[in-house]
Amino acid sequence: MSAIINFFDIEKNINTKPVLYLVKTDKEKRICKSIIEKYHSYVPSFKSVGRRIDWLIEYQDELVGMIGIGSSTYPPPKDLLRYLNISKEEYRKTFNSFANNWRFCLIKKIPNLGTMVLKEMRCNAGIEWKKKYNNDLHYIITFVGEGRDGAVYKADNWVRIGETSGLPKHKSVSMKWDDNKSLKNKFVKPTGENK
């Protein structure tokens, strides 16, 4: 038996992990905004309230999207309280240890990229949250739009904790979803886990 290894192929595959760049400048913020408005299929809004940390995503030396976390939701989803076995008051007291994966938008479909990005985001989120806000980040929650199954989150071992009842009919101006049924699935992941 004989074997050969092609070092040129190995070299080509060295940078197969996505790189997340912390958004700091106005130019980078404009790029994030443009990606969301152009490519996010069901909530093409760049607006958010409260804390926020965004990253631009590069894969094989090409810009392929953005991902961001921000302040969690208040009032807290009942399923989250049940899952963590805490009261609304306990959640309020530890509010700054929760983040919401407020946006995740990829420009291209690349197999397994979404899961790799989520892992990188989790590895960076707690560090950046502590640096920027001086709070420990314990959980990241996300909401998945109706008609989507959250496959990328499931592949990264996030736990589906429930389903929302939708949004109120009066839809306050801060709500960015199309209708009261658009917001459905909720997933949560303790940060830094690598299962």
What are these regions (language model features)?
Residues S2-G50, L56:
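Short amphipathic alpha-helix that is part of the acyltransferase structural core
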Residues M1-I4, E193-K195:
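Intrinsically disordered, low-complexity and often Lys/Arg-enriched segments
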Residues T25-R30, L81, S172, T191-G192:
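Short, structured coil/loop segments at alpha-helix boundaries
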Residues N185-N194:
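Conserved beta strand-loop-helix elements of the APE1-like EEP
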Residues L22, R51-I53, Y59-Q60, M66-K186:
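Acyl-donor binding region in acyl/amide transferases
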